[in-house]
Amino acid sequence: MIDDLFAGLPALEKGSVWLVGAGPGDPGLLTLHAANALRQADVIVHDALVNEDCLKLARPGAVLEFAGKRGGKPSPKQRDISLRLVELARAGNRVLRLKGGDPFVFGRGGEEALTLVEHQVPFRIVPGITAGIGGLAYAGIPVTHREVNHAVTFLTGHDSSGLVPDRINWQGIASGSPVIVMYMAMKHIGAITANLIAGGRSPDEPVAFVCNAATPQQAVLETTLARAEADVAAAGLEPPAIVVVGEVVRLRAALDWIGALDGRKLAADPFANRILRNPA
């Protein structure tokens, strides 16, 4: 039955590249297109954030090439990775570029796709579940909740230079976005939280750090904007992590379904009769 389902999906052709999102960690969150590509690819160029269990779906004989990029650590240059995809495709391979999360959400998938266009290499984009949604769901934190917010902002915690992005209007986000989800923000969390507080956010606003989201190593720290930097240091947390700011963090007390599997008692009223401001 499952083979019949895969038989109806598009083929990964020789000389082409698929840019595929592997989701936030759990192999069960792979899409059918992603699993199908793993079954067909001759070469799989994968990121550091791709769960090794996902790679077990690769067909026998497939070549695995690591192209992981981690902030502050030695890693291949983006242009070199993009050109490697071109080289592999021109050699007649069926190439799978497998990226954690979604390739078009802070995954530099657009840059790689533009290089393929530049060199006239056929390609397909296969979206994945981004960690800023799926990873938070595994922590029991919804990015939207009708009583809390009508908008959410996704941002990166560092720019191409490795510094806090100076093109982000921190005051505007602080005043206008009830929920903020941040990727790659651990390194500069002190500066980022200071920017948000200076922009008008309450120092007591809840914040959650979800490290190694959707994996057996998942760890969640709940804190506040004012205590975030110190609490992260005290806990010894390391990237990768998703950071979420906003009242939705309080819902984890009721929606931590993984914790419930281990015996956590979930709260019936996670807001404990708190008066919430009108959703923005």
Swiss-Prot record:
Please describe, based on the UniProt annotation, the reported consequence of changing F106A: Strongly reduces S-adenosyl-L-methionine binding. Loss of activity
Entry's InterPro entries?
4pyrrol_Mease, 4pyrrol_Methylase_sf, 4pyrrole_Mease_sub1, 4pyrrole_Mease_sub2, CobA/CysG_C, Siro_Cobalamin_biosynth, Uropor_MeTrfase_CS
A biological process term (GO) from this entry: cobalamin biosynthetic process
Named in its record, the pathway it takes part in is: Cofactor biosynthesis; adenosylcobalamin biosynthesis; precorrin-2 from uroporphyrinogen III: step 1/1; Porphyrin-containing compound metabolism; siroheme biosynthesis; precorrin-2 from uroporphyrinogen III: step 1/1
Reaction catalysis annotation? uroporphyrinogen III + 2 S-adenosyl-L-methionine = precorrin-2 + 2 S-adenosyl-L-homocysteine + H(+); uroporphyrinogen III + S-adenosyl-L-methionine = precorrin-1 + S-adenosyl-L-homocysteine + H(+); precorrin-1 + S-adenosyl-L-methionine = precorrin-2 + S-adenosyl-L-homocysteine
Q: Name one GO molecular function term.
A: uroporphyrin-III C-methyltransferase activity
Q: What is its EC number?
A: 2.1.1.107
User: Is Transferase among this UniProt entry's keywords?
Assistant: yes
- Which residues are S-adenosyl-L-homocysteine-binding? P24, G100, G101, D102, T130, A131, M184, A213, A241
Give the Pfam families listed for this entry: TP_methylase
Any phenotype upon disruption?
A: Cells lacking this gene are deficient in cobalamin biosynthesis.
Record keywords: Methyltransferase included?
Answer: yes
The reported result of mutating T130A is: Strongly reduces S-adenosyl-L-methionine binding. Causes slow synthesis of precorrin-2
* Activity regulation: S-adenosylhomocysteine is an extremely powerful competitive inhibitor of the uroporphyrinogen III methylation. SUMT exhibits a substrate inhibition phenomenon at uroporphyrinogen III concentrations above 2 uM; this property might play a regulatory role in cobalamin biosynthesis. The enzyme activity is completely insensitive to feedback inhibition by cobalamin and corrinoid intermediates.
What UniProt keywords apply to this chain's record, in alphabetical order? Cobalamin biosynthesis, Methyltransferase, Porphyrin biosynthesis, S-adenosyl-L-methionine, Transferase
**pH dependence, record text:** Optimum pH is 7.7.
**According to the UniProt record, what class of enzyme is this?**
transferase
Q: What does altering Y183A do?
A: Strongly reduces S-adenosyl-L-methionine binding. Loss of activity
Under PROSITE patterns, the record lists: SUMT_1, SUMT_2
Q: How is the subunit organization of this protein annotated in UniProt? A: Homodimer.
Q: What does this protein do?
A: It is a step in the biosynthesis of both cobalamin (vitamin B12) and siroheme. Neither uroporphyrin III nor the chlorin (factor I) is a substrate of SUMT.
Family that this chain belongs to: Belongs to the precorrin methyltransferase family.
Miscellaneous comment: Uroporphyrinogen III is a key intermediate because of its position at the branch point of two divergent pathways. One pathway leads to protoheme, and the other one is the cobalamin and siroheme pathway.
Q: What is this protein called?
A: Uroporphyrinogen-III C-methyltransferase
Upper lineage is: Bacteria, Pseudomonadati, Pseudomonadota, Alphaproteobacteria, Hyphomicrobiales
